[in-house]
């Protein structure tokens, strides 16, 4: 690779699993990439709901969900890493002029594209009091790739990539998210071959 070629950065992109992906965690999954650098990548699966509702999750952590609009929303399986830990993907809680240090929550990652991922319980406490981010997606667990691992999977045609559209995350019914993400590329699922990229 020429020295002046910038490394690939897929932060704020969707990874869309190709039909050949056999790992049950990732089959027909759409992963929102929160972070991608030469050190690796971190993302959340946005289309695999668990049987637990947000209300049920709040009961498990001794909180009462104070947001009627979120009561029936499912908690998602974010990936196979740290599956007992909660991750909250939400709209940024501060204006563009404010610094990264001004998040109202103790542990928040700022993502280009107007989103944040918070792992501290204070975001749940804000939701319990009827406040907090307007739109949220809560997962148990996350997806991670080590240095060069995602690039290797991309070279093997395990994933399609496309810039993220937050409406797919927050406004699209769960069962339609895979097809909607494909649609961002002008594709439909019937167009994908399980053998793509393999001679």
Curated annotation (Swiss-Prot):
Superkingdom, taxonomy of origin: Bacteria
GO cellular component, one term: cytosol
InterPro entries: AlgH-like (IPR003774)
Family: Belongs to the UPF0301 (AlgH) family.
Protein name (Swiss-Prot/TrEMBL): UPF0301 protein Dtpsy_2896
Species of the source: Acidovorax ebreus (strain TPSY)
């Amino acid at each position: 690779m020429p020295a002046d070629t910038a490394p690939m950065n897929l932060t704020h992109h969707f990874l869309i699993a190709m039909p050949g992906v056999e790992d049950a965690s990732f089959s027909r999954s759409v992963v929102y990439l929160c972070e991608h650098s030469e050190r690796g990548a971190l993302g959340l699966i946005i289309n695999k709901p668990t049987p637990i509702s947000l209300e049920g999750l709040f009961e498990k952590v001794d909180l009462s969900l104070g947001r009627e609009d979120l009561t029936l929303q499912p908690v998602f399986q974010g990936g196979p890493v740290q599956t007992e830990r909660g991750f909250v993907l939400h709209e940024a809680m501060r204006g563009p002029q404010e610094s990264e240090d001004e998040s109202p929550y103790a542990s928040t990652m700022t993502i280009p594209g107007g989103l944040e991922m918070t792992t501290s319980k204070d975001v749940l406490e804000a939701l319990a009091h009827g406040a907090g981010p307007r739109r949220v997606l809560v997962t148990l667990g996350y997806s991670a790739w080590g240095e060069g691992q995602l690039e290797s999977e991309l070279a093997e045609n395990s994933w399609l990539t496309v810039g993220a559209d937050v409406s797919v995350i927050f406004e699209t019914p769960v069962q339609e998210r895979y097809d909607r993400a494909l649609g961002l590329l002008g594709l439909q699922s019937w167009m994908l071959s399980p053998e793509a990229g393999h001679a």
